[in-house]
UniProtKB/Swiss-Prot annotation:
This is Acylphosphatase. Keywords: Hydrolase. The lineage of its organism: Bacteria, Bacillati, Actinomycetota, Actinomycetes, Mycobacteriales. Its EC number is 3.6.1.7. It is an enzyme of class 3 (hydrolase). GO terms for molecular function: acylphosphatase activity. It comes from Mycolicibacterium paratuberculosis (strain ATCC BAA-968 / K-10) (Mycobacterium paratuberculosis). InterPro entries: Acylphosphatase, Acylphosphatase-like_dom, Acylphosphatase-like_dom_sf, Acylphosphatase_CS. Belongs to the acylphosphatase family. It comes from the Bacteria. Residues 7-97 form the Acylphosphatase-like domain. It catalyses: an acyl phosphate + H2O = a carboxylate + phosphate + H(+).
Length: 97
């Protein structure tokens, strides 16, 4: 029986604005079949909200934290703070906000 969908909420700290990080995150999330968004925050972080199968969310989190990818992750990630919950709303696709 497949696992229920999960919601990953991740706050990405570092030099992650103005470097293509949200675009890169969107591409990886779509490749993994996730829905949600990546949004710049006023304090310089990027907020990533991704919903879908938990294993896909775990893979995205690994990539956000520095897992090997091609193309390589833009910017510099110092820390990722993540939280898991049940999906709270329905998203169409994955967008940059």
């Amino acid at each position: 029986m497949p696992e229920p969908d999960a919601r990953l909420t991740a706050w990405v700290h570092g030099h992650v604005q103005g470097v293509g990080f949200r675009w890169w995150t969107r591409c990886r999330a779509l490749e993994l079949g996730l829905t949600g968004y990546a949004a710049n925050q006023p304090d310089g972080r990027v907020l990533v909200v991704a919903q879908g199968p938990r294993p896909a969310g775990e893979k995205l989190l690994e990539l956000l934290r520095g897992g090997t990818t091609w193309p390589s992750r833009p910017g510099r990630v110092d820390k990722v703070v993540a939280d898991w919950s049940a999906p709270q709303e329905r998203f169409e696709g994955f967008v940059e906000r």
